[in-house]
């Protein structure tokens, strides 16, 4: 509907033809109203040529043409597949993961290993693997037992630098700038001893000293035993008298009967008795003289 005066029909036909020509023009072309400066309007063929030049003018690295065509075929699989057959195995850059690639038709569900939510408890041992399973189980039990024992016997222990003095002490530039006048002082490690270490060390020293003293006493006793004299004269006399009593057949202190030959025996000199008396007197000098065999008391 239109209000107001309208153009005649013959003029409307010319306007319709101009609109059809404008529709045939390229979309996006600038519409010009009014007079135009000569040379400003660009021909259609030159404009298309300029657009092609803009499309081909690329700055920096560009994707090869065959790769670009292949990517276009992936995005539009319904297009020509001849180029895909020409370059079936060529790929540039990182490949698309398989789960992002378009799939055609039904697909097999993926496997997630042997795990299943329906399995409850350990799986039964395969036939023929009973011995291997028993060995593995025994080995695991031994390892578990050793780990438990180590955990029970574990005792916390401080590191060495926390319990001992450094072997080499330095003043770190804070000492006197003179030569040392005395000997180098030794490191005092007595304060590092544990409560029972000092007592144990003293006992070991005492036991070693006692062993040395006992050995020295044994050597002195052997020397004294070699140098000491034998039994005294009284002991020798008593021993001989006891032997005579045993030979007579009577015990010591026992009363023996009267014997005429022994009791009435004349104590005078017998023939040849003088020589025997002289020999017996010679023995007196040996008894009261110094001993020849035993020179030490």
From Swiss-Prot:
Q: Where is the composition biased (Acidic residues)?
A: 77-87
Composition bias, kind Polar residues: at what positions? 88-101
> What Pfam families would the database entry show?
DUF3752
Compositional bias segments (type: Basic and acidic residues) = 41-52, 147-161, 236-268
Q: Where is this region: Disordered?
A: 19-133, 147-214, 226-277
Q: Which PANTHER family match?
A: GPALPP MOTIFS-CONTAINING PROTEIN 1
Spell out the protein name for this chain: Uncharacterized protein F26A3.7
Question: What is the organism of origin for this protein?
Answer: Caenorhabditis elegans
């Amino acid at each position: 509907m239109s209000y107001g005066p309208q153009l005649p029909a013959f003029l409307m036909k010319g306007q319709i033809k101009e609109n059809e020509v404008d529709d045939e023009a390229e979309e996006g072309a600038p519409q010009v109203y009014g007079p135009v400066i000569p040379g400003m309007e660009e021909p259609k063929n030159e404009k298309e040529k300029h657009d092609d030049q803009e499309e081909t003018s690329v700055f920096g690295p560009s994707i090869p043409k065959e790769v670009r065509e292949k990517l276009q075929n992936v995005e539009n699989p319904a297009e020509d597949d001849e180029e895909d057959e020409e370059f079936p195995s060529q790929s540039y850059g990182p490949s698309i993961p398989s789960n992002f690639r378009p799939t055609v038709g039904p697909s097999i569900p993926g496997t997630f290993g042997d795990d299943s939510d329906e399995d409850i408890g350990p799986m039964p041992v395969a036939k023929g693997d009973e011995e291997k399973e028993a060995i593995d189980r025994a080995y695991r039990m031994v390892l578990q037992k050793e780990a438990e024992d180590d955990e029970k016997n574990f005792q916390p222990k401080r590191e060495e630098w926390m319990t001992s003095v450094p072997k080499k002490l330095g003043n770190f530039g804070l000492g006197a700038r003179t030569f040392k006048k005395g000997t180098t002082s030794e490191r005092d490690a007595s304060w590092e001893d544990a409560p029972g270490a000092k007592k144990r060390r003293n006992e070991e020293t005492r036991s070693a000293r006692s062993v040395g003293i006992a050995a020295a006493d044994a050597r002195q006793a052997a020397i004294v035993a070699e140098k000491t004299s034998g039994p005294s004269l009284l002991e020798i006399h008593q021993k001989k008298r006891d032997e005579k009593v045993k030979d007579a057949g009577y015990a010591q202190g026992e009363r023996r009967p009267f014997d005429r030959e022994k009791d009435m025996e004349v104590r005078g000199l017998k023939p040849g008795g003088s020589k025997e008396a002289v020999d017996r007197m010679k023995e007196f000098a040996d008894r009261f003289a110094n001993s020849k065999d035993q020179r030490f008391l």
